[in-house]
Amino acid sequence: MAASRTYTVVQFTDSHLSEDPAACLRGVNTTDSLKAVAALANSFAAPDAIVATGDLSHDGSEASYWRFREVVSQPNIPLRWLPGNHDDAATMQRCRGAEAQPLRLGKWHIITLDSQVLGAEQGAIDAESLRRLEGELAAADAVSEYVLLCFHHNPLRTGAKWMDTIDLTNGSELLAMLNKHPSARALIHGHIHHKFERVVGNVQVLGTPSTCA
């Protein structure tokens, strides 16, 4: 029997870039900090995919999204990104190419979801996206494949009071649905700016620190 293939996915999140590359957030130059994290990622073997889970820009400027792509992209490595509460989704759309396409790595389906709610810091996965996701999970179940889910807002309370008031409002509903499907193995998110790990049923929930934390 052939050995199973291991895939590497690099996640960037909450870079909070601005139109001005010299801009700082809480005393940190966000462009410089993103470059430092990207350089660290690039010091390892090339990944199979790069996923960016929102709040890539702090001001929603087109320049900030192009700079983000320039800093994190690697030759011939697929990039997928999605909006957070600080992002301008329409501007992101103008700056994206293949980033909107589904991503498949062997038996793994990497699914990105938009949890942004316009005008709000809290997030939610809309009903249509949930219906579509359930269909994708059922299809993966049928052929014994796996799903990695990616979005911005935290679906679980983390203990950080100021973040737990602006979490994913339907996180419990989402996790209940995921645990009906054996293909659902993990989800990654940003938003909270710190590390978070928990297992809920068969789903590993991973929150990732901000590149400018």
Give, region by region, the residue ranges found by the protein language model.
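N-terminal active-site segment of His-dependent metallophosphoesterases
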Residues: 1-67, 158
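Beta-strand-turn-beta hairpins that frame and shape the catalytic cleft
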Residues: 2-11, 102-112, 137-148, 199-205
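Active-site neighborhood of phospho(di)ester-bond hydrolases with catalytic His/Asp-centered motifs
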Residues: 11-13, 49-55, 79-85, 114, ...
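Metal-dependent catalytic neighborhoods of phosphoester/phosphodiester hydrolases
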Residues: 21-23, 52-73, 88-99, 123, ...
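His/acidic metal-ligating clusters that form di-metal
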Residues: 37-49, 123-204
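Short, electropositive alpha-helical surface patch
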Residues: 62-78, 165-175, 202-211
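Active-site HxH/HxHxD metal-binding segment of metal-dependent hydrolases
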Residues: 77-98, 157, 209-212
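Active-site gating/metal-coordination segments in enzymes
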Residues: 79, 99-124, 132, 136
